[in-house]
Amino acid sequence: MSDDLFSKALENPDQDLNVELPKDDVDLGLLGDGGNERKTDEPVADAERSTGLGSGSSESESDSGSDSDSDSGSSGSEDDSADQDVEGEDEGGDAIENEDEDEDPSPSGPILSKNEILEETVPELPEDYEISEKTIITPIGVLKSAFENNIIIHATMSGEKRVLKEGSIFCLEDRTLIGMLTEVFGPLQNPFYRIKLPDSKKNLFDELKVRLGEKAFIVTPDAHWIDTFELKRNKGTDASNGYDEELPEEEQEFSDDEKEALFKKMKKQQRQRKKRDNRKLANDSDNVKVKRARQPKANSLPKLVPPLGMSSNAPMQHGYKSRNARENIKRESSATSNRNGSSPVPITQHHQQQFSANNYPFPQQPNGMPYPPYSPFPQPTNFQYPPPPFGQATPAQFSNTVPYGSLPPAYNNMSPPTQQSFMPMTQSQPPLPYGVPPMNQMQNPMYIQPPPQAPPQGNGNFQQVMELHQILLQQQQQQHQYQHQHQQDPRT
């Protein structure tokens, strides 16, 4: 359409072109029928084009009609596309509104971390607080700078021993009140003190900003100090975590490897000590429970078994038996002898020394006796031996050629019944007191008296020893009588 109008204007510059512009009479109710209108407009345009081609005389009219039709068709298509765009925008707007309704409202202002402080609290003094003329003030430093309601005072007093604490009150030389201390920072030799002023004291901030460089004082009664050695205990680093805070001990880095190794070792020992203490407490509680549950009864306890050497029935080891075993054997032997009613076979001292401890119930002593030596019974000094019986020779008449304990082998091999049949004992000597040697032994100076013997404990053993002693005396008497007879009658 635009090409036809342009060509016509060039051909006929003086002719006025009547151009019909489309009217904006779009009905909102017919937005969805744009496709149908487009279909109905297409055959109408084709019909007009065919009629325009057939009528050659009315060329201008057909051209203008076709132009108007094409303009109306194009305007109709543009209206349809505009209607579709409006509909799409309406649907998109509804979707955006739904999304806004579903999402939470976005926070207003900057995003804050967990430990971040939004606004610093400003300490304020009471309104009626005044510094009188009698109040003592002490110079502390000079006004260094002022910015954003903050007054910085550079201290001229060293803080190596102590520094001011938060809450101390500052003033000027003319006792003009500045405010309360908010923060201490900088080196200890000359620390910096920061004072935060509230927004309501804007005039005071402007006045102090003009008086920078003047001396600053502290109100001595309201000054609070903290010792520096307490601050040195807290170990700090230049690093910071995600919250711009000091790192904990387990996250700190060391410039010295030895210090780092020592720190890790200390931490490991602390963990091990803690685990050991917990385990000990758990074991103690378990042991208490087990002891209470497993306490045995008195009846269920096992019987104690004596050692092998202490039992009477146990064989002797290395020739030793305990005292209890020896006493039990003595009791058993005495009970057996009392039941049988017979005395043991007489045994001479020579043969007693040959017996081993395993064959005799009593342990062998150094003197060869079957029982331990005891102190003899006390003998009276005026004791007199009874006279020998009639017909019996005195021991002085005998020749002590044969020592005691060394009898002839033939005689030693003879049993007591044979001796009694060979020489019936018609004369008997009364038994001497226990521990008194025979007559011949008392009169023989060459005889070495054996150590006195004491009866062992127990009535049965004492009786056996007495019987054995009597038998030995009888054998010795028979021997002397036999020798005396052979000397008097050599023919026999």
Curated annotation (Swiss-Prot):
Chief subcellular location: nucleus
Outcome reported for the amino acid change (mutating residue 426 to A): In strain: SK1, V1-09, YJM269, YJM270, YJM280, YJM320, YJM326, YJM339, YJM627, YJM789 and YJM1129
Position of the signal peptide: none
Q: Which family does it belong to?
A: Belongs to the NAF1 family.
Annotated region (Disordered) at: 1-117, 237-351, 472-492
Regarding domains, what does the record say? The central region (136-221) reveals a striking structural homology with the core domain of GAR1.
- What protein name applies here? H/ACA ribonucleoprotein complex non-core subunit NAF1
